[in-house]
């Protein structure tokens, strides 16, 4: 990740720190799509923003946009090592995935009913997939 983009990611995460979790507007899926749009000048977030507001409708949308297909379609490749800017996909029991953004050795994400963005240790044994933006690099 270029230093300028890395700086921008850090500043953006700091801004997100105190924004409340709101399903469909500021959650685990909107987080990585919003960052993708900022980093790459796209408008992917609009396809889900505000279109679900409870767990049932979130799962319905997750089925329409499976992340294991979304990432490759938007220029990402699966990798094994972690770098700033990567997105960690964690599959949950309820048939949907969460996305966390890697920055400074931690995964940053928005969980259900959290007060804002939270930091997660990457050394746990939680099954996950790492995606790195490959277009243009």
State each model region's role:
Residues 1-61:
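N-terminal capping segments
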Residues 54-119:
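...with weaker cross-activation on analogous glycine-rich loops/strands in unrelated enzymes
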Residues 118-137:
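Glycine- and charge-enriched low-complexity intrinsically disordered segments
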């Amino acid at each position: 990740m270029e230093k300028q983009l890395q700086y921008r990611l850090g500043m953006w995460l700091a801004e997100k720190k105190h924004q409340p979790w709101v399903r469909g507007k500021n959650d685990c899926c909107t987080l990585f799509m919003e960052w993708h749009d900022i980093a790459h000048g796209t408008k992917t977030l609009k396809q889900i923003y505000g279109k679900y507001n409870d767990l049932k409708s979130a799962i319905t949308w997750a089925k329409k946009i499976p992340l294991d297909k979304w990432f490759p379609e938007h220029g990402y490749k699966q990798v094994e090592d972690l770098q700033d800017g990567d997105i960690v996909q964690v599959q949950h029991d309820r048939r949907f995935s969460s996305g966390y953004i890697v920055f400074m050795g931690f995964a940053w994400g928005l969980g259900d009913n959290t007060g804002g963005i939270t930091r997660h240790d990457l050394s746990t044994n939680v099954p996950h997939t790492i995606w790195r933006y490959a277009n243009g690099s």
